[in-house]
Swiss-Prot record:
Pfam families: Rhomboid (PF01694)
Protein name: RHOMBOID-like protein 9, chloroplastic
GO molecular function, one term: serine-type endopeptidase activity
Family matches, as Gene3D superfamilies: Rhomboid-like
Gene name for this UniProt entry: RBL9
UniProt main location, coarse: plastid
High-level lineage: Eukaryota, Viridiplantae, Streptophyta, Embryophyta, Tracheophyta
One Gene Ontology cellular component: chloroplast membrane
Similarity section: Belongs to the peptidase S54 family.
Transit peptide residue numbers: 1-68
Enzyme Commission (EC) number: 3.4.21.-
Record's keyword terms, sorted: Chloroplast, Hydrolase, Membrane, Plastid, Protease, Transit peptide, Transmembrane, Transmembrane helix
Membrane-related topology note: Multi-pass membrane protein
Functional summary from the UniProt entry: Probable rhomboid-type serine protease that catalyzes intramembrane proteolysis.
């Protein structure tokens, strides 16, 4: 039986290795090769013991073959040891990438957090520089970088999340201002209701005018008495009403449009609009009719006119649904005013004159809202929505325009002197349009 050596291509140290996919295929084939070599080694050992029992095999040539076979067996064992060490090293290398990958992810996440904190710190520093009003920034805006810290914990250190933040201050100021405005409007509505109750409680009979009340007797718009020097009759009719429906309509309009106008124009300008609307409406009634009238709804129409101007100039900053709701209420109030004018001493010229006065006066005093930063320069008559916002018109400008309007009315009254002019009546104007 002849002997022959088995040669296998086994990767040794220093040789080129396969990739991961090729390595799996190589390892599966290597098992079969290893089993074949083990079978060959067993067969060689049996053959070696058999050869010792045969005298012929003790010749030098046969001994050389046995030495060669034993040397090849040693080489095979060495290669198997190299394979074992290689597979052990390969297994360790497979576990290391997951650890290194996790470390890389942690480093990237930490770098991203640090970059976000840097950008946030720069933004807060810019806000701090732009803030000019006192008490706008509650605390020093500094972001401390530390390992394992989160953005939320660092923001808590800046003082933004506490109750003294700039946005919280703005909300508190707006709420306090709205409360003050509502109180002012409620006081005016209470005065109207109180005067109406006093009218019902103090009836007076006059020979020329019939049954009147004490407030109507001394405060209604009567042209002859105005020309005689009782100029206050251009002011007092704005607080007089012809009955419960009239005062209810006036109070409802005042409580609906009053807070809006008061918030947009300011409390001082709101009061000037209210007074100017009443005076202008009574003056318009003085020019067009000689009948005694009251004008309690005149100031309400002046507020509607000022509100319309504000909605037109700031339409991009106002919600459409709120505008539509109030516009419908304005139409309803106008319709009820026209109906009530046929059931009492209410002159439609009073409402029309007050509406025109509110529109004209509001056009010159209405603040224009625009978005901008706190560091920008504030222009005259423009409200900046931001850290330096101003929720009212310029009081000096409003008072100056109010003085001009009153001066024009007084001058016109002095120039007329002989009583109302020969203007067409309100019904004539309506019928001519139809």
């Amino acid at each position: 039986m002849a002997l022959f050596p088995l040669h296998h291509e086994v990767p040794c140290k220093g040789e080129v290795l396969f990739d991961s996919n090729g390595l799996r295929r190589f390892s599966s084939g290597l098992k079969h090769r290893t089993m074949a070599e083990a079978t060959t080694l067993g067969r060689d050992c049996r053959m070696k013991s058999y050869m010792k029992s045969i005298p012929y095999c003790r010749s030098p040539r046969r001994r050389l073959c046995l030495v060669r076979a034993s040397s090849e067996n040693k080489i095979t064992k060495q290669r198997l040891k190299l394979l074992d060490s290689y597979f052990g090293k390969l297994q360790n290398d497979d576990e290391k990438p997951s650890i290194s990958t996790g470390d890389d992810i942690d480093r990237k996440a930490e770098l991203n957090v640090n970059e976000e904190l840097d950008s946030l710190s720069a933004y807060l520093d810019k806000l701090q520089k732009d803030a000019k009003s006192k008490g706008l920034v509650s605390s020093t805006l500094d972001v401390v970088k530390s390992e394992g810290g989160s953005v939320a914990s660092k923001l808590r250190k800046t003082g933004i999340e506490n109750n003294n933040s700039p946005f919280q201050q703005f909300d508190d100021e707006d709420q306090a201002e709205d409360t003050l405005n509502f109180y002012a409007v409620s006081i005016l509505a209470s005065i109207n209701v109180g005067v109406c109750l006093f009218e019902a409680a103090a009836p007076v009979r006059n020979n020329n005018m019939g049954l009147l009340s004490l407030p109507l007797l001394y405060g209604a718009k009567i042209n002859d008495l105005i020309l005689a020097g009782e100029w206050w009759r251009l002011v007092t009719p704005m607080f007089l009403h012809s009955g419960i429906p009239h005062v209810a309509l006036s109070s409802w309009a005042l409580l609906t449009f009053g807070p809006k106008v008061c918030r947009d124009y300011g409390l001082f300008t709101f009061c000037l609009i209210y007074i100017l609307g009443g005076v202008s409406g009574n003056f318009m009634s003085f020019l067009h009719t000689a009948d005694p009238t009251v004008g309690g709804t005149g100031p309400a129409f002046a507020l509607i006119g000022a509100w319309l101007v504000d909605q037109n100039q700031n339409k991009e900053m106002i919600k459409s649904n709120e505008y539509e709701d109030l516009f419908q209420k304005a139409i309803i109030m106008t319709g009820f005013g026209l109906i009530l004018s046929h059931f009492g001493p209410i002159d439609d010229w009073t409402n029309l004159g007050a509406l025109i006065a509110g529109i004209v006066y509001g056009f010159f005093t209405c603040p224009v809202l625009q978005l901008g930063s706190g560091g920008s320069e504030r222009q005259e008559g423009i409200v900046t929505v931001g850290p330096e916002k101003q929720n009212s018109a310029d009081p000096c400008k409003s008072f100056l325009l109010f003085t001009i309007f009153v001066a024009v009315i007084v001058t016109s009254l002095l120039l007329i002197g002989d009583g109302p002019l020969d203007f067409p009546t309100y019904d004539d104007v309506v019928y001519s349009l139809i």
